[in-house]
């Protein structure tokens, strides 16, 4: 997406006073995580991306690493057996990195999955009255180890790194640092405490040290089920923001409502890579995640015995899911274009420009809250264009940026230990006068409350900071008088506190998944 005012500037590891003023207002438009956000993706939950995170690792002794996390398969009930939540072996899951600001991937990490029955495809059988009969469950006993013999279904995956175009670039296998294998084991989902007594310990055995071709330092890799790390007042928001204005504008009530998805799990693809492997002469990188499916599929009306034998896919890869900033497609892109956005690449984002320059969400909030005349009046919304499409100059804008939607991270800004992180990222840090410049919108950490930050921006917080003298360069129309809410815009929240979500202090950072039974 392009506008005359899209700026080009060098990245910096510090915050100028001008930038501090901008960040005080908050950035983004997300009101909910990317769960079931587009019509087509509701039919294919295994390839539905829910959240994307990209941040400097804050685990001790990992300061020079960047963690990439892509979550898929939303709203998993922990008790969802007997098949649980294996990922799609017919899909291509990818994490893309743009390291020169041109809106095109320079590095892609590709994940492919394979799910096989034990005993060379024969599965597990029991002797029942002299006959060997296959069992109906994915496990035949307790599970504790890699390649556990009591698992009837073995879930494995491979990872490749592609340099250049995702389909025509140079493809090389990511391999285990310990044995050179290009195939990795995925832990079974958290069936329950009787089957897996120590799931945290079991899952930790599936954290792999890996070698990435072209990278001098080894990386870490984990794929498996986690507790959904996102906190949001989901049902209330989509029910026309069914909450009193006095609650969502009172900072003392930031945790007045329960987290609607606090009892759900997701499936995580996590990769921790040395920052030198991701950058290319600029400290700022952009990232996003996608999934593609084969263009055609045949369904066998008489599938043979085995595992997932009904479908036979073929043809070219077709992208069906896309997620960068949290979350554009859910509450910014119009319903008629949601599937189109999921199929698009950042280089083609000019087709969606009106959704950012003239967003409908503020007007919808006026209707939902019965507060006419509260939406900002500055058009085009150059404040939001900067946040979504270029990054913020002096923080996370690449030197030669082409306007496009993706999450952007300045890898030169140091990580902050978990206990010292501000849940409002850079916005909260400015308010507190602290030293945490490593959070959203400079990348995104699991603790960052992107919902609350985003509500501030969508209702005009950036223009409040821009002032009457166009201090931030958003144009003369972006000024306090264009923000009917005034200072109240800084108090908005969804009444669910991201900071209370349980998280781990180190890789893969997201909490142990909830068990199917206790």
Model-derived features: positions:
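N-terminal secretory signal peptides that target proteins for export/translocation
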Residues: 1-13
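Short, functionally important structural connectors and interaction interfaces within domains
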Residues: 15-16, 258
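Bacterial N-terminal signal peptides
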Residues: 16-27
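Surface-exposed extracytoplasmic segments
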Residues: 31-518
């Amino acid at each position: 997406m392009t506008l005359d005012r899209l700026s080009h500037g060098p990245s910096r590891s510090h915050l100028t006073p001008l930038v501090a003023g901008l960040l005080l207002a908050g950035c983004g438009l997300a009101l909910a995580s990317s769960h079931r956000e587009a019509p087509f993706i509701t039919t294919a939950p295994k390839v539905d991306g829910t959240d994307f995170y990209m941040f400097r690792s804050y685990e001790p002794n990992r300061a020079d690493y960047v963690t990439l996390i892509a979550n898929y398969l939303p709203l998993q009930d922990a008790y969802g057996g007997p098949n649980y939540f294996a990922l799609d072996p017919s899909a291509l899951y990818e994490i893309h990195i743009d390291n020169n600001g041109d809106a095109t991937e320079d590095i892609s990490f590709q994940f492919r999955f394979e799910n096989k029955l034990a005993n060379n495809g024969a599965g597990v059988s029991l002797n029942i009255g002299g006959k060997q009969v296959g069992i109906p469950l994915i496990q035949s006993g307790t599970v504790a180890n890699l390649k556990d013999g009591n698992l009837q279904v073995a879930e494995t995956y491979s990872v490749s790194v592609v340099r250049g175009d995702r389909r025509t670039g140079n493809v090389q296998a990511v391999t285990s640092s310990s044995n050179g294998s290009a195939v990795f084991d995925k832990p079974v989902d958290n069936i329950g405490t009787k089957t897996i007594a120590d799931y945290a310990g079991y899952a930790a055995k599936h954290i792999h040290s890996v070698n990435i071709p072209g990278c001098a330092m080894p990386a870490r890799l984990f794929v498996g089920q986690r507790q959904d790390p996102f906190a949001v007042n989901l049902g209330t928001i989509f029910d026309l923001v069914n909450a009193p204005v006095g609650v969502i504008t009172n900072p003392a009530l930031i945790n007045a409502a329960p987290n609607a998805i606090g009892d759900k799990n997701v499936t995580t693809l996590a990769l921790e890579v040395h920052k030198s492997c991701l950058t290319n002469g600029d400290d700022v990188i952009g990232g996003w995640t996608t999934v593609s499916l084969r263009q055609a599929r045949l369904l066998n009306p008489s599938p043979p015995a085995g595992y997932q034998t009904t479908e036979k896919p073929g043809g070219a890869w077709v992208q069906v899911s896309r997620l960068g900033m949290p979350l554009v497609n859910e509450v910014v892109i119009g319903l008629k274009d949601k599937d189109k956005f999921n199929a698009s690449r950042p280089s083609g984002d000019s087709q969606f420009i009106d959704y950012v320059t003239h967003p409908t969400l503020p007007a919808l909030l006026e209707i939902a809250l019965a507060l006419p005349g509260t939406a900002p009046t500055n058009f085009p919304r150059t404040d939001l264009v900067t946040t979504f499409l270029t990054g913020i100059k002096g923080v996370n804008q690449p030197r030669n940026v082409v306007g496009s939607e993706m999450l952007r991270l300045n890898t030169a800004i140091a990580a902050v230990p978990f206990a010292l992180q501000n849940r409002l990222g850079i916005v909260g840090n400015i308010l507190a006068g602290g030293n945490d410049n490593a959070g959203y919108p400079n990348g995104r950490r699991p603790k960052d409350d992107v919902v609350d930050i985003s509500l501030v921006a969508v209702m005009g917080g950036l223009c409040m900071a821009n002032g009457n003298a166009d201090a931030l360069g958003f144009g003369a129309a972006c000024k306090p008088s264009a923000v009917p809410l005034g200072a109240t815009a800084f108090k908005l929240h969804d009444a669910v506190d991201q900071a209370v979500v349980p998280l781990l202090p180190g890789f893969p950072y997201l909490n142990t998944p909830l068990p199917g039974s206790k």
